[in-house]
């Protein structure tokens, strides 16, 4: 995989500077690596044009990064033949209820006494299950919710267990399954349902099915949820430090996010008012002087840095990361 990334990141400023035979070779290698097949030659040609445009974007960005313009690098991945608009349409899924408003009953009020650690990584504490892949189903909200529940289950019982996002996709009537949803609706469902099944009991299929919840497969409960004060990164930091992994919403609509590879992600075009994707904050820290959040995505391990991204922290609520943050009570 690393060999592929090196090959695909050869500088290319324009197609004219990139011999067609090299592009042909890289295209075939990319298709083989990610097992890409197309329905027709016309479809493949259109997908290759998108891939070439993305490859050029990646190469130019990385040249700029080498000159100090950016704090992060990009790399070609399995989303290479998709536009950023297609990624948002098919692989995000945050849908905030029109009537959503924070209640004093569910507002997280931080305990400001005492210091929080300068960094924390719940992966190292055993609170985080392996990275999953939601596929082309708008179920990011389910994976984000499940991740937060898994962290609290570990904290309460000492056991790390994969919970079922499919259970939420199929059964949370307030959400729209693969058509999108919201995390607090998922937490409320688990509370009212008195449980959520394990992944083993209710496997993920990546499409809407009838609700098949079975109490015999129940692996966790929920007593409610708390929401972080809107846009307050200090409160979010304290929640992550004191509570555990937190469900967050971000703008994932940019090509720079689609092909993120390493470094601290900050794109001034990221719109904090355009929240479209739910992910999981599993920690925070500082890398090369840059404060960041450690974010677990649900696009598989081929995306980002083995499925994760470091997102800028305390940079004016970049990408809206603290606007719709919440966690379950267990």
Curated annotation (Swiss-Prot):
Disulfide bonds: 137-178, 171-211, 270-319
Tissue: Expressed in the thyroid epithelial cells.
Gene giving rise to this polypeptide: CTSK
Its EC number(s): 3.4.22.38
Keyword Protein transport recorded: no
Positions annotated as glycosylated: 104
UniProt keyword terms in alphabetical order: Cell membrane, Disulfide bond, Glycoprotein, Hydrolase, Lysosome, Membrane, Protease, Secreted, Signal, Thiol protease, Zymogen
InterPro entries the UniProt entry points to: Papain-like_cys_pep_sf (IPR038765), Pept_asp_AS (IPR025661), Pept_cys_AS (IPR000169), Pept_his_AS (IPR025660), Peptidase_C1A (IPR013128), Peptidase_C1A_C (IPR000668), Peptidase_C1A_papain-like (IPR039417), Prot_inhib_I29 (IPR013201)
Location(s), subcellular: Lysosome; Secreted; Apical cell membrane
Official protein name in the record: Cathepsin K
GO molecular function, one term: proteoglycan binding
């Amino acid at each position: 995989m690393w060999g592929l990334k090196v090959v695909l990141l050869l500088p290319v400023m324009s197609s004219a500077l990139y011999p067609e035979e090299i592009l042909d070779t890289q295209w075939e290698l990319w298709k083989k690596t990610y097992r890409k097949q197309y329905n027709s030659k016309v479809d493949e040609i259109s997908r290759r044009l998108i891939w070439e445009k993305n490859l050029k974007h990646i190469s130019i960005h990385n040249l700029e990064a080498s000159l100090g313009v950016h704090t992060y690098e990009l790399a070609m991945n399995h989303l290479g033949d998709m536009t950023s608009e297609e990624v948002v349409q098919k692989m995000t899924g945050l849908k905030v209820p029109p009537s959503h408003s924070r209640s004093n009953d569910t507002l997280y009020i931080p305990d400001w006494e005492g210091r929080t650690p300068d960094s924390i990584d719940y992966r190292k504490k055993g609170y985080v299950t392996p990275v999953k892949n939601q596929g082309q189903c708008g179920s990011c909200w389910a994976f984000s919710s499940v991740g937060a529940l898994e962290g609290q289950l570990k904290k309460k019982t000492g056991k790390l267990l994969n919970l079922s996002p499919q259970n939420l996709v199929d059964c949370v009537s307030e959400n729209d399954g693969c058509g999108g949803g919201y995390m607090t609706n998922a937490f409320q469902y688990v509370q009212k349902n008195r449980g959520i099944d394990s992944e083993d009991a209710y496997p993920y299929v990546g499409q809407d099915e009838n609700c098949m919840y079975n109490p015999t497969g129940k692996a966790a409960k929920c007593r409610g949820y708390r929401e972080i004060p809107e846009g307050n990164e200090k409160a979010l930091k304290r929640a992550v430090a004191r509570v555990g992994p937190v469900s967050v919403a971000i703008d994932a609509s940019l090509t720079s996010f689609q092909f993120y590879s390493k470094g601290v992600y900050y794109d001034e075009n990221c719109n904090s008012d355009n929240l479209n994707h739910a992910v999981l904050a599993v920690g925070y820290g500082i890398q090369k002087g840059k404060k960041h959040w450690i974010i677990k995505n649900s696009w598989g391990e081929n995306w980002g840095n083995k499925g994760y991204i470091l997102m800028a922290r305390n940079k004016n609520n970049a990408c809206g990361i603290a606007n719709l943050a919440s966690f379950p009570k267990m």
